[in-house]
Amino acid sequence: DIRWLTGFTGGTAQLLVSRSNHEAWLLVDGRYFERAVDETTASRASVHIERVVPDVSTDEMIARIVGTSSLAVDPSHVTAHFMNVLQGHCSVVHERTQLDDLRRVKDDSEISLIASAAGIADNAFASLVSDGLFGKTEKQIRNRLDHLMREAGADDVAFDTIVATGPLGARPHHEPSDATVEDGHGVVIDFGAMVQGYKSDMTRTIRVGAVSDEYQRMFELVLEAETAGVASVKAGVVGAAVDAAARAVFIREGVDHECVHGTGHGIGLYIHEQPILSPRCTAVL
């Protein structure tokens, strides 16, 4: 949120915004002070940069700025301990920010960066597959794909790349191991690239060797579900309706119990952003 609002990309920081006059203060570790000045200037953010000094705690600095005013804090973004400490210095009220709702609508520059990250990941994946997967371990495939994305211009990977071969592919968040890709395996790869903080996220499954009738059937069902879900995406539609459109294909075929995750999610500076397309999603697209 701080990066999105101010452009600052450094480590731990706190941002205070005055409701009365809209003044803002960015509290940063002294090691990031110059960086904060440069990055907030470049992003044209109107914010006072305050250096956190060793002999004064962050909560004390916040209390000095807030004074006798009340401090609204989003409890989902701070620890209970920090909340308790703040309450010892100033009047604290719990209030959820609206930043998630604001951030889910991307501007043209954000969309361009996400598209760039997706393009890098897509091309890296194509190179990976052309080299072949048979006989390689999950870790080797992970390392090679990560290298290809960075070599193609990614600032970094978007998250820890997942590679799962054979039966391990049933684990959505499997950690790559020394398991080797064998003939007849399906290899699930979940990966993404990052460009200027913005991320891409895609999952691909490659069948090594002959494709069985059952595997072909499942491929066609997933493709049909994806097509139905994409077709249902329109302005004004509730997120749960998109999930339902995709999930209906699996329900029809009696395999919905195998679909243990949501249909999709937003993406940006975080890998998972609103809206989260699940049966519980009430957000309007």
Each language-model region and where it sits:
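Active-site neighborhoods and metal-handling regions in enzymes and metal-associated proteins
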Residues: 1-285
